[in-house]
Structure formats: C-alpha cells, structure tokens
C-alpha cells in the first residue's frame, strides 16, 4: 500500500516553487504520493521576483527536485507561466505536457521566441527544442476529466475549465483517488471581456490555490474602459497627436484591436464626430510576436 502522508503532511499536498512572494515564476507541485507529483505551470521570473530555492530572473535553472514530477499541466501560455520549460527539460523532466487545444497551438510560438532570447539563437538548437516540445504536448478538451498515467499506484485525474484570461487559458481541477480535489486557478479573466467567454466556476474544491495578482483592486467595467480609450483617441485626433499603448502580445493586444475597431466603426457613422476624420487614425502594431498571434 502507498503511504498516506509525506514530509509535508497527508497526500495530496502542494509545494510552491514560484509566484509565492511575487507574481511571476508560477510553478506549483501537486504531490500525490512519495513517487508521483504533477507540476502546474513553470514560468519565468521577472524583475526582482525569486523562488523559494533562490531562482530568479538572473538564475533560471530549476532549483527543485524534478525526479517524481511525472506530468506538467499548463494553465495558459503567458511567459511567467511557461517560460522556464527549456530549463525544466534540462533538469531532466521527460513527462507529458497537458494544456488546452488553443494553448497547444500557441505554446511553440511563445517558447520559440523565449528560447531565442534567453537560451540560444542557433537554428539547430531551436529546432531541437521545438521538436522535443511538440512530441510531449497533449492537448485536452475543456470540461472533461483526463486520467494521468502515473507510477506509484495512485489514481489521479485533471480537468481543464475556462478561465477567461487569454485564448486557451484554463484553471485546473486535480482529483486524487476519485475524491479529493485541488483547484489551481492560473490567471483569471474578467466577466465582461470583449472577445472571450467569462471564466467558469469550480463545482467543488477541497483545496483552492488562487492567483492574487491585483490584490483587492476593483476593476472598472468594459464600458468605462472603452469610454476612456475613446476620449484619448478623440484628443489625439484633435491635437494630431499619438497614443502609445504598451500591451502583452497575447490577450491584451487582441482585446485592444477589437475595442479600437468598435470605436472606429461607431464614430465613422456618428454625426457627433463629423468634425473628426476617423479615417486619418492609423493603427500600428509594432510587435512581430503579437502580429503572429493575432
């Protein structure tokens, strides 16, 4: 029989290897037994954020034992959740990588860019890494339990549910022995996002590991955000000025383009803004990576 507890308490339990005292470097180990665990995300550290083992933006080598980690589940493909995969491979991880179908399509693009910037630009090494990555990717549908083929005689399943953060994002429900459920939220989106369905809610959870990137900040609604954006554009048109908007390549950029198109479409047909030439407002997306995603 498998022991019912380990050095940190009864199974299952969670070890946090990143995004503990900061918001980047997400890596959470769901420990199922002495022989088996599943890693949820393996992200890049940014700024001054560090992991409990000392890893940080200047030292991305994996600083935790990977010998019992038999699978990796990704919540979404932002770099602070997936950026350390090259170092995870180098540390000896050789298991499957589970994620949603859209994430499986986006992940090689994200990591090709990250690999060239952080590891090597040599075409042969980039191609070798991407081949290894794609061999291990296992796309999962939303809202279906998937059995994990783990050693150690313990039954474990995962289920992805929509998180509404970016295309392909999910929160992960992890179930041990058909009963105990641990939920990892990943990053959660807003209920009124313009191009994505709202996040689902978990049916039940014995343990909930939830992000708190924005703390207790109250976010304004979509209408208020769009009104502020439109006011900036009107001012730029009047002054013949420029609006510069920094945005993540995946998610924010596409939402901005959608909102800009909506504003332009409405105002081209509005008598209120006849004195403004909306056709004279060029929109320039200055990001090769964002262009590929879009």
What are these regions (language model features)?
Residues 6-73, 78-82, 87-255, 261-276:
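His/Asp/Glu-rich metal-coordinating catalytic cores
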Residues 251-252, 276-294:
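Short, conserved secondary-structure transition motifs
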């Amino acid at each position: 029989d498998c022991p019912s507890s380990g050095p940190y308490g009864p199974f299952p339990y969670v070890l946090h290897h990143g995004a503990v005292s900061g918001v980047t470097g997400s890596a959470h180990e769901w420990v199922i037994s002495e022989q088996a665990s599943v890693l949820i995300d393996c992200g890049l550290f940014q700024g001054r954020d560090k992991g409990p083992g000392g890893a940080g933006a200047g030292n991305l080598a994996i600083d935790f034992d990977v010998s019992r980690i038999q699978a990796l589940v990704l919540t979404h493909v932002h770099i602070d959740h997936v950026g350390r995969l090259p170092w995870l491979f180098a540390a000896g991880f050789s298991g499957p990588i589970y994620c949603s179908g859209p994430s499986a399509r986006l992940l090689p693009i994200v990591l090709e860019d990250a690999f060239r910037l952080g590891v090597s630009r040599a075409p042969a090494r980039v191609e070798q890494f991407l081949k290894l990555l794609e061999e291990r990717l296992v796309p999962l549908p939303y809202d279906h339990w998937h059995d994990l083929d783990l050693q150690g005689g313990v039954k474990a399943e995962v289920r992805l549910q929509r998180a509404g953060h970016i295309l392909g994002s999910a929160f992960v429900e992890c179930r041990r022995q058909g009963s105990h459920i641990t939920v990892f939220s990943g990053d959660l989106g807003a209920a009124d996002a313009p191009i994505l369905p709202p996040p689902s809610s978990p049916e039940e959870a014995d343990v909930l590991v939830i992000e708190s990137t924005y703390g207790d900040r109250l976010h304004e609604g979509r209408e208020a955000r769009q009104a502020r954006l439109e006011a900036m554009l009107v001012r730029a048109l009047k002054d013949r000025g420029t609006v510069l908007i920094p945005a993540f390549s995946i998610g924010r950029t596409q939402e901005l383009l959608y909102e800009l198109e909506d504003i332009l479409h409405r105002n081209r047909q509005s008598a209120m803004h006849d004195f403004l030439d909306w056709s004279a407002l060029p929109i320039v997306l200055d990001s090769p990576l964002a262009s590929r995603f879009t």
